[in-house]
Design a protein with these regions (language model features):
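Active-site-proximal loop->helix
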Residues: 21-38
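Glycine-rich anion-binding loops and their surrounding alpha/beta cores
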Residues: 11, 33-40, 45-189
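Core alpha/beta catalytic barrel or barrel-like domain that forms the active/cofactor pocket
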Residues: 15-21, 83-86
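Conserved catalytic cysteine-centered active-site region
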Residues: 7-15
């Protein structure tokens, strides 16, 4: 989520499709909602926001109402499932370029190949070696690129790219309030 905000601030266009947290403390929808974003906004209004600010959020339950029927079961399970893969596969903006965090290494190369069949052009999937489904500063990050129809894999070490290596406990949050504070802190620094 944070990485996407930085991309938008740098002039990139971000059409984030997401949901409330089902397996962690805070999902993308939780963060946007805390900032006062209307999760049930109509698509035309979301398009206006994207054109004006280069970033928008599309609440999965608004665009795919059937997902409401599995929300309680997902929360009860408390772990990542195939439903976590549906977001990138069903992004209503039909984006051609995506950065996707995956919860299992087996999806690093599988997800880009599925999206390629749907017309995607440039896809990057990432999973950190400490188990996070996003870039981490506490471990190396395994990435897979789909670019111009070809797949590439690599490992990104935070120290090699000039970042301070942290411990996992330094970046873990324990409450939704902590998640919001951490998000705002990074944006302000």
């Amino acid at each position: 989520m944070l990485f996407r905000s930085v991309i938008a601030a740098g002039g990139g266009i971000v059409a984030k499709h997401g949901n409330r947290s089902s397996s962690g403390l805070s999902g993308s929808a939780d963060i946007f909602e805390k900032f006062g974003y209307d999760l049930n906004m109509e698509p035309a209004k979301i398009t206006d926001i994207l054109e004006k600010f280069n970033i928008c959020f599309m609440f999965a339950q608004k665009f795919h109402p059937a997902m409401k029927n599995v929300a309680t079961a997902r929360k009860t399970l408390g772990k990542r499932t195939a439903f976590n893969l549906l977001g990138p596969l069903t992004n209503p903006a039909n984006v051609k370029n995506q950065l996707i965090g995956v919860f299992s290494e087996e999806f690093l190369d599988r997800l880009p190949m599925i999206l390629k069949r749907k017309g995607a052009q440039n896809i990057m999937t990432v999973r950190s070696e400490d188990g996070m489904d996003e870039f981490s500063t506490s471990a190396k990050n395994r990435i897979c690129f789909l670019k111009e129809g070809k797949m590439f894999t690599n490992v990104v070490d935070p120290e090699i790219v000039g970042l301070h290596k942290s411990s996992l406990k330094d970046i873990q949050i324990s409450t939704k309030v902590d998640a919001l504070k951490s998000f705002v802190s990074v944006l302000n620094n």
